[in-house]
């Protein structure tokens, strides 16, 4: 059975392909920033935000593809319960890295499987991360190295 991946993440697609899971990608096109703002206003913590985003994406695509299994996923970075968003510029990326530099933070990832527009399974887990202490020069070198991928990752760095 071919599952639907409700994600534009190339990494998630590669993982499914690596394990020979027959899949097709249908992007949910939900406004993640709007959803995050709403959840934060309601007092949601980063775990709940990650879970809800995965579920919303999965359910949206699932409702348009009845009787198909849809996999939605989301990951966020949390530093002292503060959600770290994707940067919009290199300057913002540098500021985020400075904030994470030499500090403990968490990668929170959620996965949701939906069918007929409703969640049938979900899981959320976290990994504790600590970036070693880097100089401004080392941070700039890193940003130069990852180039346009700067804007694709929460927390700016890529651990996949």
Question: Which residues does each PLM region occupy?
Answer:
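Short beta-strand scaffold segments in enzyme catalytic cores
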Residues: 75-77, 107-114, 157
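Acidic/polar active-site rim loop that often engages polyanionic ligands
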Residues: 35-39, 78, 118-125
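Structural motif
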Residues: 2-3, 68-69, 105-106, 110, ...
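Generic enzyme active-site microenvironment
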Residues: 72
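Active-site oxyanion/phosphate-handling segment shared across diverse enzymes
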Residues: 124-160
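Active-site-adjacent loop/tail segments of enzyme domains
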Residues: 75-105, 131-133
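N-terminal polybasic phosphate/anion-binding patch
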Residues: 1-69, 82-83, 137, 141, ...
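Anionic-ligand binding region
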Residues: 96-98, 110-127
């Amino acid at each position: 059975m071919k599952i639907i991946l409700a994600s534009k993440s190339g990494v998630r697609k590669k993982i499914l392909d690596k394990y020979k899971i027959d899949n097709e990608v249908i992007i949910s096109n939900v406004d993640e920033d709007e959803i995050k703002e709403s959840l934060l206003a309601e007092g949601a913590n980063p775990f709940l935000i990650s879970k809800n985003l995965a579920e919303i994406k999965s359910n949206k695509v699932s409702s348009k593809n009845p009787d198909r299994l849809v996999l939605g996923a989301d990951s966020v970075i949390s530093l002292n319960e503060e959600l770290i968003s994707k940067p919009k510029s290199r300057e913002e990326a540098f500021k985020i890295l400075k904030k994470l530099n030499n500090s403990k933070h968490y990668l929170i990832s959620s996965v949701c499987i939906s069918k007929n527009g409703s969640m049938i399974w979900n899981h959320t887990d976290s990994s504790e991360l600590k970036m070693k202490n880097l100089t401004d020069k080392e941070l700039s070198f890193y940003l130069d190295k990852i180039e346009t991928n700067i804007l694709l990752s929460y927390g700016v760095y890529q651990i996949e």
